[in-house]
């Protein structure tokens, strides 16, 4: 298969390239060349810009394209319309954030997506990100009706994830000592290893599969306590988990998902089913999940090498999520001293 990937050097795109090359496909990358341009020296690289700089794509043909870097419907529409007669199949990587709320447990792909009062908005914020992704989905499908695969991942984790939303916990548990853990060990969470997502997506592309698929995991109930216990086992650390109540965290202004990644207050009815998304359709289509310990082990190993990356230091080394050490100490002290 002759495959075009829009992006391809940061996170999911990187593993799509690796999976495609491992399966003997011919790969072409289209991006600005700003992130890890030294990767894949034998792969054709077309330089350009999603926003108005698509000239390098004109006059070419591929069997399929995977769009890993679309956030604005205008931009996705431009590439999809340009490629409509040049490719047989278009995959758009979307997000479960397209759903406006998660009040229902087990929400599947039939749930309505979010909308914007002003569909011309192009500022990507926490409020607009999901509806913009939904509009991107529509733009791709309109350009290639019946030939578009829409993948809606949940939280993607693993090596080369600079968001630190999962990496924070892997690193923090490995450091050992008393660790502030949110709420209680039994609350459910969902994640998907970037390599599992990439390999499944590629298999779907090979089959020219169309339609909409939620893609997170695993295929069993995973609790946050399971994640921390696995991190401790893999790193062989002496970490001690102090479970701090949700009420205390809210009262002390702890920011969900940012200061304490993965944690969403259960008191928010709109988020009740956030970690109970149905992925039955994707699993039936062949999505499989590696052992959590493998994800933790590989993430921990990669995190130890971040200083050696060719990414800019601000991106590579500056934590993007998680409690600052002094903030964690302060909160633990307040928790132990409460009356």
Give the positions of each predicted feature.
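Conserved Rossmann-fold NAD(P)-dependent oxidoreductase catalytic core, especially the SDR/UDP-sugar
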Residues: 78-134, 142-143, 149
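Conserved glycine-rich Rossmann-like NAD(P)H-binding loop of the short-chain dehydrogenase/reductase
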Residues: 26-32
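N-terminal Rossmann NAD(P)H-binding glycine-rich loop of SDR-like oxidoreductase domains
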Residues: 3-23
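A short C-terminal helix-loop "cap" of Rossmann-like NAD(P)-dependent dehydrogenase/epimerase domains
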Residues: 170-182, 237, 273
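Substrate-positioning beta->alpha
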Residues: 164-169, 182-207, 211-214, 225-226, ...
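Conserved beta-loop-beta element that borders a ligand/cofactor-binding pocket
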Residues: 136-160
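Mid/C-terminal beta-alpha module of Rossmann-like enzyme folds, strongest
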Residues: 204-280, 297-300, 307-339
